[in-house]
Amino acid sequence: MNLKTHAFNDRGRIPSRYTCDGENISPPLSWDGVPGEAKSLALICDDPDAPSKVWTHWVIFNIPPDSTGLEENVPDAGRLPDGSVQGYNDSGTLGYRGPCPPSGVHRYFFRLYALDTVLDLEPGASKEDVLEAMEGHVLGEAKLIGLYRRG
Protein backbone atom coordinates (compact mmCIF):
# COMPACT_ATOMS: atom_id res chain seq x y z
CA MET A 1 0.00 0.00 0.00
CA ASN A 2 1.08 3.56 -0.64
CA LEU A 3 0.01 6.72 1.21
CA LYS A 4 0.77 10.20 -0.09
CA THR A 5 -0.36 13.81 -0.25
CA HIS A 6 0.19 16.53 -2.81
CA ALA A 7 0.51 19.00 0.11
CA PHE A 8 4.02 17.89 1.15
CA ASN A 9 6.65 15.26 0.36
CA ASP A 10 7.28 12.26 2.60
CA ARG A 11 9.60 13.54 5.34
CA GLY A 12 8.96 17.07 4.07
CA ARG A 13 7.68 20.14 5.90
CA ILE A 14 3.95 20.24 6.55
CA PRO A 15 2.59 23.58 5.26
CA SER A 16 1.33 25.85 8.05
CA ARG A 17 -2.18 25.69 6.52
CA TYR A 18 -2.53 22.23 8.15
CA THR A 19 -1.24 23.32 11.58
CA CYS A 20 -2.31 25.43 14.56
CA ASP A 21 -0.40 28.32 12.96
CA GLY A 22 -2.71 28.22 9.94
CA GLU A 23 -6.20 26.94 9.26
CA ASN A 24 -5.67 23.73 11.28
CA ILE A 25 -7.42 21.64 8.62
CA SER A 26 -6.58 18.10 7.58
CA PRO A 27 -4.35 17.67 4.54
CA PRO A 28 -5.60 15.85 1.46
CA LEU A 29 -4.44 12.23 1.45
CA SER A 30 -4.51 9.59 -1.26
CA TRP A 31 -3.63 5.92 -1.35
CA ASP A 32 -3.47 2.88 -3.56
CA GLY A 33 -2.60 -0.79 -3.33
CA VAL A 34 -5.31 -1.66 -0.78
CA PRO A 35 -5.66 -5.46 -0.57
CA GLY A 36 -8.82 -6.71 -2.31
CA GLU A 37 -10.00 -8.56 0.79
CA ALA A 38 -9.98 -5.41 2.95
CA LYS A 39 -13.31 -4.64 4.65
CA SER A 40 -12.29 -1.22 5.99
CA LEU A 41 -9.39 1.20 6.42
CA ALA A 42 -8.17 3.11 9.46
CA LEU A 43 -5.90 6.15 9.64
CA ILE A 44 -4.00 7.40 12.68
CA CYS A 45 -1.81 10.50 12.83
CA ASP A 46 0.44 11.03 15.82
CA ASP A 47 3.57 12.84 17.02
CA PRO A 48 6.16 10.61 18.74
CA ASP A 49 8.31 13.66 19.55
CA ALA A 50 5.81 15.30 21.92
CA PRO A 51 7.39 15.98 25.34
CA SER A 52 5.22 13.85 27.62
CA LYS A 53 3.81 11.09 25.39
CA VAL A 54 3.03 10.19 21.80
CA TRP A 55 0.41 12.83 20.91
CA THR A 56 -2.57 11.70 18.83
CA HIS A 57 -3.67 14.22 16.19
CA TRP A 58 -6.24 12.19 14.25
CA VAL A 59 -8.13 8.90 14.47
CA ILE A 60 -10.47 7.90 11.65
CA PHE A 61 -11.69 4.35 11.00
CA ASN A 62 -14.22 2.29 9.02
CA ILE A 63 -13.15 4.18 5.92
CA PRO A 64 -14.65 2.32 2.93
CA PRO A 65 -11.99 0.00 1.45
CA ASP A 66 -12.71 1.14 -2.10
CA SER A 67 -11.98 4.78 -1.28
CA THR A 68 -8.78 6.24 -2.68
CA GLY A 69 -8.23 9.07 -0.23
CA LEU A 70 -9.54 11.80 2.04
CA GLU A 71 -10.25 15.31 0.82
CA GLU A 72 -8.65 18.31 2.46
CA ASN A 73 -10.53 19.64 5.51
CA VAL A 74 -12.42 16.53 6.64
CA PRO A 75 -15.28 17.81 8.87
CA ASP A 76 -14.90 17.38 12.65
CA ALA A 77 -17.90 15.04 12.86
CA GLY A 78 -18.20 11.68 14.57
CA ARG A 79 -19.69 10.01 11.50
CA LEU A 80 -18.96 11.10 7.95
CA PRO A 81 -21.30 10.67 4.95
CA ASP A 82 -19.23 7.77 3.55
CA GLY A 83 -19.58 5.80 6.82
CA SER A 84 -16.15 6.67 8.19
CA VAL A 85 -16.02 7.25 11.94
CA GLN A 86 -13.72 9.65 13.78
CA GLY A 87 -12.29 9.25 17.24
CA TYR A 88 -10.97 11.72 19.75
CA ASN A 89 -7.54 13.26 19.36
CA ASP A 90 -5.42 14.16 22.39
CA SER A 91 -6.82 17.70 22.32
CA GLY A 92 -10.11 16.11 23.39
CA THR A 93 -12.00 16.84 20.17
CA LEU A 94 -13.29 14.74 17.29
CA GLY A 95 -11.39 14.78 14.04
CA TYR A 96 -8.08 16.30 13.03
CA ARG A 97 -5.98 18.71 15.09
CA GLY A 98 -2.85 19.86 13.33
CA PRO A 99 0.74 20.08 14.49
CA CYS A 100 1.46 22.63 17.21
CA PRO A 101 4.82 21.60 18.68
CA PRO A 102 6.13 23.55 21.68
CA SER A 103 9.72 23.60 20.37
CA GLY A 104 11.98 22.05 17.77
CA VAL A 105 11.14 19.93 14.75
CA HIS A 106 8.56 17.21 15.34
CA ARG A 107 7.67 14.24 13.15
CA TYR A 108 4.03 13.51 12.33
CA PHE A 109 3.29 9.94 11.33
CA PHE A 110 0.20 9.31 9.18
CA ARG A 111 -0.42 5.55 9.19
CA LEU A 112 -3.05 3.89 7.01
CA TYR A 113 -4.17 0.34 7.84
CA ALA A 114 -6.15 -2.08 5.66
CA LEU A 115 -8.31 -4.30 7.85
CA ASP A 116 -10.18 -7.56 7.26
CA THR A 117 -13.07 -6.31 9.41
CA VAL A 118 -15.21 -3.29 10.16
CA LEU A 119 -14.48 -2.01 13.67
CA ASP A 120 -17.36 -2.16 16.16
CA LEU A 121 -16.53 1.17 17.79
CA GLU A 122 -18.49 4.37 18.28
CA PRO A 123 -17.50 7.94 17.37
CA GLY A 124 -15.06 9.27 19.93
CA ALA A 125 -13.08 6.03 20.24
CA SER A 126 -9.50 6.60 21.35
CA LYS A 127 -6.40 5.61 19.39
CA GLU A 128 -5.85 2.87 21.96
CA ASP A 129 -9.41 1.54 21.42
CA VAL A 130 -8.86 1.47 17.66
CA LEU A 131 -5.44 -0.21 17.89
CA GLU A 132 -6.85 -2.86 20.23
CA ALA A 133 -9.83 -3.55 17.95
CA MET A 134 -7.48 -3.77 14.93
CA GLU A 135 -5.26 -6.39 16.57
CA GLY A 136 -5.07 -9.51 14.39
CA HIS A 137 -6.99 -7.84 11.55
CA VAL A 138 -4.30 -5.81 9.73
CA LEU A 139 -3.82 -6.85 6.10
CA GLY A 140 -1.50 -4.02 5.08
CA GLU A 141 -0.04 -0.73 6.23
CA ALA A 142 1.32 2.44 4.65
CA LYS A 143 3.09 5.38 6.26
CA LEU A 144 3.67 9.04 5.46
CA ILE A 145 5.81 11.31 7.64
CA GLY A 146 5.56 15.08 7.75
CA LEU A 147 7.80 17.48 9.69
CA TYR A 148 6.86 20.72 11.40
CA ARG A 149 8.56 23.37 13.49
CA ARG A 150 6.85 26.55 14.62
CA GLY A 151 8.26 29.94 13.78
UniProtKB/Swiss-Prot annotation:
UniProt-listed SUPFAM superfamilies: PEBP-like
Lineage top rank: taxon: Archaea
Family annotation (InterPro entries): PEBP (IPR008914), PEBP-like_sf (IPR036610), YbhB_YbcL/LppC-like (IPR005247)
Transmembrane segments: none
Listed NCBIfam families: YbhB/YbcL family Raf kinase inhibitor-like protein
Family, similarity comment: Belongs to the UPF0098 family.
Protein name in UniProt: UPF0098 protein MTH_273
Species whose genome carries this gene: Methanothermobacter thermautotrophicus (strain ATCC 29096 / DSM 1053 / JCM 10044 / NBRC 100330 / Delta H)
Phylogenetic classification of the source organism: Archaea, Methanobacteriati, Methanobacteriota, Methanomada group, Methanobacteria
